[in-house]
């Protein structure tokens, strides 16, 4: 975690890392002095992957129908794991403020490890905050849901990414690739 690096952990890992020919980092700020070559590979999306390729309008509608999302009304979407750092409860609170002015729907879609007790607690908190609003769709998706995520983003009027600590997530790049406004 770059926001709070642990020097003792780095020193422990360094001896293992230097046993390789090269170390790959996603940003220059993450690299550290090493005796081996370092390479920068910035995070990116795959435009031809299932998560980002063009989809037919019929396919997008099919996914929305499966989840009972009405494409005729504005859709606000956040794609992320169910994690407190993604602030899904804060997203619901923001949606409720918007809902006072615009008849819209909210989709919170993502996954997480089923063996992560905190992730399941977050999901429970989100479901509790969303209950009694039929226009909030909390979708806990399996790992192989790239087409569904793609369709949900393409059906969206606006995509949110309310991460509390992440500077710029790939879901932002994916939504922008699909020409969706991102907040």
What are these regions (language model features)?
Residues 169-172:
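Short glycine/serine-rich donor-binding loops of glycosyltransferases
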Residues 3-64:
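A short, active-site helix/loop in glycosyltransferases that binds the activated sugar's phosphate group
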Residues 110-151:
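Nucleotide-activated donor-binding/catalytic signature segment of Leloir-type glycosyltransferases, i.e.
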Residues 53-75, 99-102:
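Nucleotide-sugar donor-binding and catalytic loop/hinge architecture
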Residues 157, 179:
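A short alpha->beta transition loop at the rim of the catalytic pocket in nucleotide-sugar-dependent
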Residues 65-86, 92, 106-107:
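Conserved donor-binding/catalytic core segment of Leloir-type glycosyltransferases
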Residues 181-183:
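Short hydrophobic beta-strand element within catalytic cores of glycosyltransferases
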Residues 164:
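Aromatic "clamp/platform" in nucleotide-sugar-dependent glycosyltransferases that forms part
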């Amino acid at each position: 975690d770059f926001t709070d690096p642990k020097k003792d952990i780095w020193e422990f890992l360094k001896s293992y890392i230097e046993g390789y020919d090269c170390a790959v980092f996603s940003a220059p700020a993450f690299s550290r002095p090493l005796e081996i070559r370092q390479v920068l590979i910035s995070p990116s999306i795959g435009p031809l992957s299932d998560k980002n390729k063009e989809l037919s309008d019929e396919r997008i509608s099919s996914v929305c129908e499966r989840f009972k999302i009405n494409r005729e009304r504005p859709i606000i979407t956040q794609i992320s794991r169910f994690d407190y750092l993604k602030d899904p409860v804060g997203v619901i609170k923001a949606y409720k403020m918007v809902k006072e002015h615009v008849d819209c729907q909210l989709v919170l879609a993502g996954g997480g490890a089923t063996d992560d007790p905190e992730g399941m607690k977050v999901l429970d908190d989100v479901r509790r905050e969303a209950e009694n609003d039929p226009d909030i769709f909390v979708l806990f998706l399996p790992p192989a849901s790239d087409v569904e995520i793609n369709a949900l983003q393409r059906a969206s009027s606006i995509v949110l990414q309310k991460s509390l600590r992440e500077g710029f997530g790939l879901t932002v790049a994916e939504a922008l690739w699909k020409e969706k406004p991102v907040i």
